[in-house]
Amino acid sequence: MMKQYYIGVMSGTSLDGVDLALMDFTLNPPKLMATDFTPMPEKIREKLTALLRSGETSLRNLGEIDHQLGLLYAESINRFLQKVRLKSEDICAVGCHGQTVWHSPNCEFPFTMQIGDMNLVAAKTGITTVGDFRRKDMALGGQGAPLVPAFHQDLFFAAERLTVVLNIGGISNISVLEENCPTVGYDVSVGNALLDSWIELHQGKRYDKDALWAKNGKISTALLTDLLAEPFFQQAPPKSTGRELFNLAWLNKKLEKFTALSQPMPSPQDVQRTLVEFTALSIANELKKLQKSDRTNLLLVCGGGARNPLIMQRLTALLAEWQVSTTSEFGLDIDYVEAAAFAWLAYRRIHNLPSNLPSVTGAKSEVSLGVIFPK
C-alpha cells in the first residue's frame, strides 16, 4: 500500500518558530512519524511582534512579511524532508496554517487573517499545499476557531470517560470529548502570550524557562482579581480570542490602576507569578463547569504551557477531581499536536471530507476547510 504521508506546519501566537509534523494516514488512527522545529528568525519575529502589538502596518510591510514567511515555511519543509530522508513526491500534501496576525469574528465585518504565501510554499517545495483554513468556516457564520477539536475527537475520544484536551499555546483552548454529546471546543483564556511578553520586556528572555522567575514571585491578589474580571470569561461558548485582547497594552491598563488608586505597584516578578496563577485559575474555572461525578475526568495538556512546571502544578492542585496528564503519554508529542492537526486538515481537504465541527465553531454547516495551492 502506498504511504499516505502529509506534513503539517504551524506557527502560533507565541512566535517562537515553526512546528512541523509528518503524519501517516495509511494507519488508523493516523500515526505521528517525525517532527521538527525551525526557530523564528529574529528579523521576522520583530516585524510580527510590532504588527501584532499595534495592529497597524503598511501594505508594503504586510506583503513583505507574507513573502518572508512563505519562504520560511518552504525552507523549513525542505530541511525536514532531508532530515527524514523523503522526497517531495513522497508527500501527498502540506497543510500550512500560516501566521495569524488578526482574528476578529464578532465585529460588524468579521474576518481573520493568516499570512505566509502558500503559492511560494507549493512552488518552492514541489508539494501541493493547503492553506487558508479558517475563512470558509467564518463565511458560514462560524468563529473560524478552534479547528483542532475535530482532530482531537479522532484521536482521543473514549466512551467511558470525559476527556478534555487543553492546548496551552499563546492562547489556551480546549476540546471537550464526551459520549452522546457533540464535541465542543473553544478558547478559554490566555496561555503563554502574556507570560512570554512580560519576561521579554523585563528580563530580555523569550520565555520563563521552568518558571524559574515566576516561582520566586508573589501573587498580587488585587491584580489577579482584576485580570479575572475580564468580560471574555463570562461569554458563553463557542468563543475565540487572541493577542488582540490579551496583550501588554491590556495588562498595562490593569497595572495603571495601582498608580491611579495610589496603591503599591507589584514588582515585575510578582506580576509574572500572578500571570501564572491567572492562566491556571481561569482555565480551571472553566473546567470545573464541565466535570462529571459519574465517570473519570481526564485532562490531556499539550502545547508549550505543558512544559511550564508551575502551570502544571497549579492545574493539578486546582483540579482535584481530574486526572491531569499530557498528550505525550497518549502517543502525541505535546509540542506538535497543532502541527499534526494541520496535516489531518490537509488530508481531509484533499479527500474533500468535512473538517470543521459546527458544534465547535458555530458555523451553519460542515465543510471541507482550506484552499488548495497546486504544486
Curated annotation (Swiss-Prot):
Its EC number is 2.7.1.170. One of its GO terms (biological process) is peptidoglycan turnover. One of its GO terms (molecular function) is ATP binding. It comes from the Bacteria. ATP binds at G12, T13, S14, L15, D16, G17, V18, D19. Keywords: ATP-binding, Carbohydrate metabolism, Kinase, Nucleotide-binding, Transferase. Pathway: Amino-sugar metabolism; 1,6-anhydro-N-acetylmuramate degradation; Cell wall biogenesis; peptidoglycan recycling. InterPro entries: Anhydro_N_Ac-Mur_kinase (IPR005338), ATPase_NBD (IPR043129). Disulfide bonds: none annotated. It is an enzyme of class 2 (transferase). It catalyses: 1,6-anhydro-N-acetyl-beta-muramate + ATP + H2O = N-acetyl-D-muramate 6-phosphate + ADP + H(+). PANTHER family: ANHYDRO-N-ACETYLMURAMIC ACID KINASE. Belongs to the anhydro-N-acetylmuramic acid kinase family. Catalyzes the specific phosphorylation of 1,6-anhydro-N-acetylmuramic acid (anhMurNAc) with the simultaneous cleavage of the 1,6-anhydro ring, generating MurNAc-6-P. Is required for the utilization of anhMurNAc either imported from the medium or derived from its own cell wall murein, and thus plays a role in cell wall recycling. This is Anhydro-N-acetylmuramic acid kinase.
